[in-house]
């Protein structure tokens, strides 16, 4: 007995240590858990046979059990209560008045939210940090790194990955040429002349010494500013017409899909339309929920924001090029996502390879490639979509979606793991992950 009491504190210490390691360990990104029919769960998904939950026998048995239970219970004797008719009418009137007042208050709240929803919608987005709880705790982004990840599955929320360098913290990094303006004050003309002579013509004076060849100076400055990362508005229309141009909405042209359709294309840095709102930044990283800022790569239900404009990235080749790599560092408890190229239109990403970092580091590097959208028709009792759901400590559901096949005509695939036609699958308790299989449902 004394020996057991002496060993009890040691056992408690080991349990606490294991719990601390489990909580404080490196949390892998959910994109790493790509559970598809090509993995070890292929046979389970292929041979999956589900029966009707409420069978006729179960219903009849339940009704019989209910009847037996109800026949054995005797009703309790109730005493008659004399109620005044006038008091009952007054109570009903007060209840109706309170309900009417509650409906009016609810309508006022809804009108207030609809009015201010467009103005302050982005302010209500929850912001999480993969390290610490402020911008100062985040590392500085590497070249072509993802600075923020926006989840649009349910309520939008942002996970900050890193801080953009100071050289990239220019919200409108686009040069607008000074065209001839007929209307303008003398002060503005003086400012333009001073700006051109003291700033734009500085390199010209060093090369030629005189203000003579304006065409040469403009070309020289244009190439110099392009090397610094600026984008000229004259080049935007030319890039828009490229056949390899990515519209960042791969599901917009797919038939019978549940994703929102839209005609928005991936714009470039600072190139905004007349009706598009100004881009907001957090730590130098764009934080708007749309793809019009030119720094966004859309994949499934996530938007990946970058410090650099995405049009500078080359276009990937299906199944051959790695679109991005996820590197986990256990000692720093951070994950770095580096984008190498952008997927073509109507493409999705998938996990293709995992390799150790090397150099004695315990982390891994996950490689992702591009794949065209599946055109295979779903067979009978075959899941059309797989949901991988992880419960986070911030009381959020992080969900990854894998489309397995296309539902036949007249059917739809569930878009949420809580909708009808979705059945719970395998669980991974060590990673706090639950999988769900979605099946085709007939349209109402």
Curated annotation (Swiss-Prot):
Alphabetical list of Gene3D superfamilies matching this protein: 2.20.20.150, 2.20.20.160
Gene Ontology biological process: anterior/posterior axis specification; dorsal/ventral axis specification; eye development; eye-antennal disc morphogenesis; genital disc development; haltere development; imaginal disc-derived wing morphogenesis; imaginal disc-derived wing vein specification
Tissues showing expression: During embryogenesis, expression is in a segmental pattern in the ectoderm and in the nervous system. In the eye imaginal disks, expression in photoreceptor cells begins a few rows posterior to the morphogenetic furrow. Also expressed in the wing disk. In the adult, expression is seen in the retina and lamina.
UniProt repeat feature Two-fingered domain 1 part, residue ranges: 123-165, 285-307
Location of this chain's protein in the cell: Secreted
Major localization class: secreted
Keyword annotations: Developmental protein, Disulfide bond, Glycoprotein, Repeat, Secreted, Sensory transduction, Signal, Vision
Superkingdom field: Eukaryota
Chain's role: Regulates cell determination; development of ommatidia and optic lobe. Is a signaling molecule involved in the process of axon pathfinding in the eye. Part of the Ras pathway regulating programmed cell death in pupal eyes; activated by lozenge (lz). Antagonist for the Egfr receptor (gurken). Inhibits Egfr signaling without interacting directly with the receptor, but instead by sequestering the Egfr-activating ligand spitz (spi).
Name of the protein described by the UniProt record: Protein giant-lens
Species annotation: Drosophila melanogaster (Fruit fly)
Gene, per the UniProt record: aos
């Amino acid at each position: 007995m004394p020996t057991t009491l002496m060993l009890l504190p040691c056992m408690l210490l080991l349990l606490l240590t294991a719990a601390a390691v489990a909580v404080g360990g490196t949390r892998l990104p959910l994109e790493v858990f790509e559970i598809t029919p090509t993995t070890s769960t292929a046979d389970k998904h292929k041979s999956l046979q589900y029966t009707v939950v409420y069978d006729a026998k179960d219903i009849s048995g339940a009704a019989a059990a209910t009847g037996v239970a109800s026949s054995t219970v005797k009703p309790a004797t109730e005493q008659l209560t004399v109620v005044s008719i006038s008091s009952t009418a007054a109570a009903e009137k007060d209840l109706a008045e309170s309900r009417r007042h509650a409906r009016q208050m609810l309508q006022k709240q809804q009108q207030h939210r609809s009015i201010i929803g467009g103005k302050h919608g982005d302010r209500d987005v929850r912001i999480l940090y993969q390290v610490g709880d402020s911008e100062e705790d985040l590392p500085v982004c590497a070249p072509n790194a993802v600075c923020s990840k926006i989840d649009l599955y349910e309520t939008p929320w942002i996970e900050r990955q890193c801080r953009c360098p100071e050289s990239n913290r220019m919200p409108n990094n686009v040069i607008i040429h000074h065209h001839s303006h007929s209307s303008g004050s003398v002060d503005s003309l003086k400012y333009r002349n001073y700006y051109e002579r003291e700033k734009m013509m500085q390199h010209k004076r060093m090369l030629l010494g005189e203000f003579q060849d304006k065409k040469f100076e403009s070309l020289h400055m244009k190439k110099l500013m392009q090397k610094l990362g600026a984008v000229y508005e004259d080049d935007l229309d030319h890039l828009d017409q490229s056949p390899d141009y990515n519209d960042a909405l791969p599901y917009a042209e797919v038939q019978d899909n549940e994703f929102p359709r839209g005609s928005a294309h991936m714009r470039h840095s600072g190139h905004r339309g007349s009706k598009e709102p100004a881009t907001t930044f957090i730590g130098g990283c764009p934080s708007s929920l749309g793809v019009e800022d030119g720094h966004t790569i859309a994949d499934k239900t996530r938007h990946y924001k970058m410090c650099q404009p995405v049009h500078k990235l080359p276009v990937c080749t299906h199944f051959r090029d790695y679109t991005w790599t996820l590197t986990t560092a256990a000692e720093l408890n951070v994950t770095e996502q580096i984008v190498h190229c952008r997927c073509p239109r109507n493409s999705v990403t998938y996990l293709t390879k995992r390799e150790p970092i090397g150099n004695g580091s315990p982390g891994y590097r996950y490689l992702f490639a591009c794949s065209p959208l599946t055109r295979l028709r779903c067979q009978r009792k075959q899941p059309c979509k797989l949901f991988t759901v992880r419960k986070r400590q911030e009381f959020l559901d992080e969900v990854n979606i894998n489309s397995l096949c296309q539902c036949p005509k007249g059917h739809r695939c569930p878009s949420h793991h809580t909708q009808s036609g979705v059945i719970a699958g395998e669980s991974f308790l060590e990673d706090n992950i639950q999988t769900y299989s979605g099946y085709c449902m007939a349209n109402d």
